[in-house]
Structures are given as structure tokens and as C-alpha cells.
A protein has these predicted regions:
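Intrinsic disorder/low-complexity segments in short proteins, especially the signal peptide
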Residues: 9-15, 210
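Short, internal active-site loops enriched in acidic
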Residues: 91-92, 258-260, 324-329
Length: 344
């Protein structure tokens, strides 16, 4: 077992960094001179404000996870920069999310026009380190890395309605986004199969809509497991997750899908549908014909109330409202909808 562990590098006392990470930086230039030797005596020093202090703490945590080394952090001064890892902002750098990493025997410097740019440089350094559990030293070859994102919007999506994920898992997902320099998280929170965010003005959305009495097993299947399933995020949890993401320079874009994909909401408040129900939170995958009633004034009040609370929770510039897969069969036969069409 020890031989295998050593082969994997898990208990090795020394190893080399590898700068060929994902996403690959724009420019990796080998520099002259000796490598830097990262060890337990290394300190992380930072120039700047609370954002840079947080960056330094993140880097210390990342290095501890990868190597077992527990490095201390400190505000940079004239005496403590040489031989250590220095985090700094540089007003001469033009791209707000860009960064520069310089490694030499004298130390490591990560520079960025903003603290956000420095954070992305930290991710590149983090990914360059080998995975060790008891490292005494890591050698980082002399190098100059210059990088900046090609795309302003770099995001991923997570559907937490068809398959519910815990708040802790969502944070782990955000960690993975941060690791890969993502800056947007599209959080899918409502569906036919579940309404998974607390709305205080409409408590039945989570009392009823967050839970389904069974789930179709497999794709294009009529097999139902008849197992109660679901969950939801309290507003307190949402605020915590929003801050967690913001600390990692990730903006969360919540999705409240409408007027389709609203069966869970209709199960909680059947008066919002064209037929008045009864409705049941969706079991199977696909498109349901029951959607919000477009001719009912209560529908528009419901939408306003929900979005008011969502906007209070999420500081994002955008709120995603879906708009897809909304069959019109119910509207075509609904007197209220037809009257609305006629009037408007």
C-alpha cells in the first residue's frame, strides 16, 4: 500500500508543480534562474483591502488541502515580501480579470488589476500544485504566466428541482466553478417536479410544491418508484450561498421558470391554473400541459410577489424566467385566457 501511495504522490515529501492547467493560460513563459521552493516556512503576504485578505486566506486553505502545509498570512511590508508569496494589485494592468504570476527563487508574485484578477491567478497556482498529503517541499519552476479570460460570461447551470442537492453540495459546486475561473452560476430552482426555494408570502410552495410522491425511474419509462422526494432552500440558506459565491467572484442567476414548468406551484395554489385542479407535483420527465393561467389577475400578482422576494435575495443584474415549453392547449379552452386575448 505504501508503494502505491508513493507512486501516486500522495505521501511524497517533495514534488514539482505543473503549470499546464485547465483552463490553459494564454502565455506560460519559462524563466531563467532557479525554482522556488514552497515549504512550511513560506508566508502569504498581501497588499490591499479586505478582498485581498480573503484571497490570501483562500490561498492558504488551498495549499493546506493540496500539500498539508499550513501557511500564515500577513499584510505586506518592506521586510516580509522576499522569499514569500506576494498578492498585489497593479493599476497598470488593463484587463480587470487578468493576472500575472511570476515565480523565481526569490518568491512568487501574483498580480492583478483587481482582487478578482488576483483570485484567478490564485486558482492557476492552486491547480499547478501536486496533490500531496504530507509535503515537506514543492518545487515551482521559474516562470512568468500572463492570462485573462476570453469571455466575459463564463457560467454553469445546476438543476436543483428535478434532482435536489443540499446547500453544502451547492457550495461544493461553486468551489468547482471557482477552480475553473467561472463567474456565473445559473441556479434552476423551480420545475414541474419541485419548487425548491422558500417564498414567505406563499408558504405552500415549499410545504406542498417542494415534495413529490414519486419519481419516474429512467428515461421514457412508466415505472414510478413511489418514494417521497424533494427539499428546498430557506431564504437564510440562499443568502448564505449568495455570499459564498460572491466571495469567490461568482454571480448567481436564479431561474424561476414561467409560465410553463409550474406544476409544482399549481399543486400548491391550484387557483393559478386554467382548470382549477386538482394538480400534483410532477413525477415524470417531459412537458406538462398545465401552466399558469394567463387570464387570471391572481397569476400576475403571484409573479410579482415571487419576483419581489427573488430580487431581494439575489443581487444579480439578471433573473432568469424560463419561458420555454409552455403548451397553449389550456389557454385555448380557458374562458379567462380567451377573454384576456380578446381584450388586449
Amino acid at each position: 500500500m505504501m508503494t502505491l501511495a508513493l507512486a501516486l504522490g500522495l505521501t511524497a515529501t517533495a514534488a514539482n508543480a505543473d503549470y499546464r492547467v485547465v483552463p490553459l493560460p494564454r502565455e506560460i513563459a519559462t524563466a531563467k534562474g532557479d525554482a522556488y521552493r514552497l515549504n512550511g516556512e513560506t508566508r502569504i503576504v498581501y497588499q490591499g483591502d479586505a478582498d485581498m485578505a480573503r484571497n490570501a486566506t483562500f490561498l492558504a486553505e488551498y495549499i493546506a488541502e493540496k500539500t498539508g502545509m499550513k501557511l500564515t498570512t500577513a499584510v505586506a511590508d518592506k521586510k516580509n515580501q522576499r522569499g514569500n508569496i506576494v498578492l498585489r494589485t497593479d493599476a497598470k494592468m488593463k484587463e480587470a480579470e487578468g493576472y500575472r504570476i511570476e515565480v523565481s527563487a526569490r518568491g512568487i508574485t501574483i498580480s492583478g488589476a483587481t482582487a478578482q484578477g488576483v483570485f484567478y491567478g490564485i486558482q492557476t497556482l492552486r491547480k499547478s500544485l501536486p496533490v500531496l498529503t504530507q509535503a515537506e517541499e514543492v518545487t515551482l519552476p521559474a516562470v512568468v504566466i500572463n492570462d485573462a479570460p476570453r469571455f466575459a460570461y463564463r457560467g454553469m447551470h445546476l438543476d436543483c428541482s428535478r434532482h435536489f442537492f443540499s446547500a453544502d453540495f451547492v457550495k461544493q459546486y461553486i468551489d468547482m466553478l471557482a477552480l475553473h475561473n467561472m463567474n456565473r452560476f445559473h441556479w434552476h430552482l423551480t420545475e414541474d417536479q419541485g419548487w425548491n426555494i422558500e417564498i414567505k408570502k406563499y408558504p405552500r410552495l415549499t410545504e406542498v410544491g417542494a415534495w413529490r410522491s414519486g419519481t419516474t425511474v429512467g428515461r421514457n419509462s412508466d415505472v414510478d418508484d413511489h418514494v417521497r422526494y424533494g427539499g428546498f432552500y430557506t431564504q437564510e440558506q440562499v443568502r448564505d450561498i449568495v455570499k459564498y459565491a460572491a466571495d469567490r467572484y461568482i454571480t448567481i442567476i436564479p431561474e424561476i421558470d414561467m409560465p410553463g414548468h409550474m406544476l409544482a406551484a399549481l399543486a400548491a395554489y391550484p387557483e393559478l391554473g386554467c382548470t382549477g385542479g386538482p394538480y400534483e407535483v410532477g413525477h415524470y420527465w417531459g412537458v406538462y400541459r398545465d401552466i399558469l393561467c394567463g387570464g387570471n389577475p391572481k397569476t400576475y400578482q403571484f409573479i410579482k410577489d415571487v419576483l419581489d422576494e427573488i430580487c431581494d435575495l439575489f443581487p444579480s443584474e439578471y433573473i432568469h424566467i424560463g419561458g420555454d415549453e409552455a403548451p397553449k392547449m389550456r389557454w385555448e379552452k380557458c374562458p379567462k385566457c380567451q377573454q384576456m386575448i380578446s381584450d388586449k
